[in-house]
Amino acid sequence: GNRQSASLYDMIPAVPQNSKPFGEWNKAKIMVYKGTVVHGQNDENVLEYHLWTKQWTDMLQASKFSEDKWPLAFELLNNCGGENHEGFIGLQDHGDDVWFRNIRVKILD
């Protein structure tokens, strides 16, 4: 479903769902370039979407982040990056043990 590893939470499931079992490292990659976002997991691209499009807004409206259900989240996500299309990188978990290693950021021209 759309709440598993590498998915776009509550919007797009990662296909294939190729996460490794507990105790093994997963390799993740998120590429954002001119509004196109690609999620990769364990050396396979698992989903793609496009920010700042009607499709993006429609996906938000069909999710838990809709304007009716969560107005602040909708506003932030629908306008992510602001006028300059810049933002932040965040690492998140929901109370379970989690480890990160070898984090790299590359600016695409």
Model regions: which residues?
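Carbohydrate-interacting regions of secretory-pathway proteins
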Residues: 1-109
